[in-house]
UniProtKB/Swiss-Prot annotation:
Auxiliary subunit of the mechanotransducer (MET) non-specific cation channel complex located at the tips of stereocilia of cochlear hair cells and that mediates sensory transduction in the auditory system. The MET complex is composed of two dimeric pore-forming ion-conducting transmembrane TMC (TMC1 or TMC2) subunits, and aided by several auxiliary proteins including LHFPL5, TMIE, CIB2/3 and TOMT, and the tip-link PCDH15. May contribute to the formation of the pore. InterPro entries: TMIE. This is Transmembrane inner ear expressed protein. PANTHER family: TRANSMEMBRANE INNER EAR EXPRESSED PROTEIN. The gene is TMIE. Residues 1-27 form the signal peptide. One of its GO terms (cellular component) is membrane.
Length: 156
C-alpha cells in the first residue's frame, strides 16, 4: 500500500459502502420462525357473533325488517296498492279513463279573456280580433244579412 498514495481513505469508503449494501440485503432475508402457524379463523355460520353480542341471523333479521318497514312506509305515502279483485282493476281503469277525458276537454276550453267581454275595450280591437280569428258560418250569415240590409236602405 505504500505505492498508492490516498489508497487508505478510498479503502475505508469502499468498505463502508459494502457494509451498507450487506446490511440492506441481510434485512431482506427471511428467517424461519419456530412458532406454530396461525390458526385459521372459524367458518362464518349463522351462529357467528358479529357485533354487540348479536349473532349473524339477528343482524340479517333486523336489517331486513328495517328495509321492509321503509318499503311499506313509501308505499303508504305514495298510495301504491295492488288491486286484488277484478272489480277494483276495472274501477281503476274507468277512473283513469275519465280523468284523461276530463283533461282532454279542459285543453279545448279557450282562455277566460276570450270568453268574456272586457269593459272599456275598444270596438276596433274587437273587429281586429274577429278578422284574426276564423269566422264561423253563423258569423258570415249575420254579416251578409247586415250588408243586404245596408244595400236595401241605400237603394231606397
Amino acid at each position: 500500500m505504500a505505492g498508492w498514495p490516498g489508497a487508505g481513505p478510498l479503502c475505508v469508503l469502499g468498505g463502508a459502502a459494502l457494509g451498507v449494501c450487506l446490511a440492506g440485503v441481510a434485512g431482506q432475508l427471511v428467517e424461519p420462525s419456530t412458532a406454530p402457524p396461525k390458526p385459521k379463523p372459524p367458518p362464518l355460520t349463522k351462529e357467528t357473533v358479529v357485533f354487540w353480542d348479536m349473532r349473524l341471523w339477528h343482524v340479517v333479521g333486523i336489517f331486513s325488517l328495517f328495509v321492509l318497514s321503509i318499503i311499506i312506509t313509501l308505499c303508504c305515502v305514495f298510495n301504491c296498492r295492488v288491486p286484488r279483485t277484478r272489480k277494483e282493476i276495472e274501477a281503476r281503469y274507468l277512473q283513469r279513463k275519465a280523468a284523461k277525458m276530463y283533461t282532454d276537454k279542459l285543453e279545448t276550453v279557450p282562455p277566460l279573456n276570450e270568453l268574456t267581454e272586457v269593459p272599456g275595450e275598444d270596438k276596433k280591437k274587437k273587429k281586429k280580433k274577429k278578422k284574426d280569428s276564423v269566422d264561423t258560418v253563423a258569423i258570415k250569415v249575420e254579416e251578409d244579412e247586415k250588408n243586404e240590409a245596408k244595400k236595401k236602405k241605400g237603394e231606397k
